[in-house]
Amino acid sequence: MGCQGNKPPIALFIAGCAVVLCLLFPHAGPGADGHPLDRFVLSDTDIPGFSIIRGPDYYGPESLWNYIDGGALPYLDYGVRDVVTYTGLWKPDSLEIVVDVYDMADSRGAFGIYSNERFPGYNFIEIGIEGYLTDNSLCFWKGPFYIKVFTREDSPSTTAPLDSLAKALDNRITGSGGMDAYFSFFPEEDRLAHTEAFIAKNVLGQDYLSRALSVNYKRGEEEYQLFLIMNKDSGTAGGNFLKYREFIRQYGEMTEKTVSGWDESFIGRESWYGTLVFVRRGQFILGSAGLSDEKLAQSHLKALAAGLPR
């Protein structure tokens, strides 16, 4: 029947096995045509004293589970596109170092997964857009990339090789792709450093709320958060606002107070987040969670909204 005819059963079986293997296991190498992340695979030529002893291995969204198991879920939520990982030996100290490079497709996704894994008390360093150093790891993000350089030793004698490798990787990222411009609209008063976050899904514990920016604040002994939730259009935002308002009405406490100057608003209280002041303008939902001073919360939201497109 020619080239377009039906394949015999054994051929179909072999083809099916090949598809399953491709999904379950990473590529052992870049292949004849190379891989988009090959430029991040360092060698002794790039870093004298460093040589790869395992890998590189390449993963995609379908196979990342095989590398980091359940840890893959947040990476998938933030839009991971490609991953390369390899282990090298730092010969001067006989130290094995692992390099993970995550291509998160865009800078918002890279920052999002970075912000999901870092804590405000970390030792932050100047690398990429932002990075931090622990006893055995150096992690940073820049553009669409989130990069982790670490050793499995709890307390290596030196972190100098981590720094050398990270700087070499940083230099291979063209452009900046820095912090989301919307963060500049969040008020500075009471703002806590290194608490900015991009939340991809389940904002405020609600599965219908996604794509939010948040910043933590502290006033006296009271800690609170400001949220900017981005929706695709005003209709979607209105529907989501209604759902959240009804959730608070049912499971929290809803007051009769409203905030003037917005498309919609409510003031309520919830056991986990405390006092809530939420408003909507067009496609944006803005909220204060945990600040008992309702007037100050309204002032913060007004300042945040001043920079948003109408």
Locations of regions flagged by a protein language model:
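Bacterial Sec-dependent signal peptides at the C-terminal "C-region" and cleavage site
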Residues: 3-5, 19-35
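Surface-exposed amphipathic alpha-helical segments
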Residues: 38, 153-182, 291-310
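Short Gly/Thr-rich strand-loop-strand
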Residues: 44, 49-78, 104-143, 184-209, ...
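Bacterial N-terminal signal peptides that target proteins for export
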Residues: 3-14
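Structural recognition of the beta-strand scaffold that forms the well-ordered cores
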Residues: 100, 139, 146-149, 278, ...
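A short acidic-to-branched-hydrophobic micro-motif
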Residues: 76-114, 149, 214-240
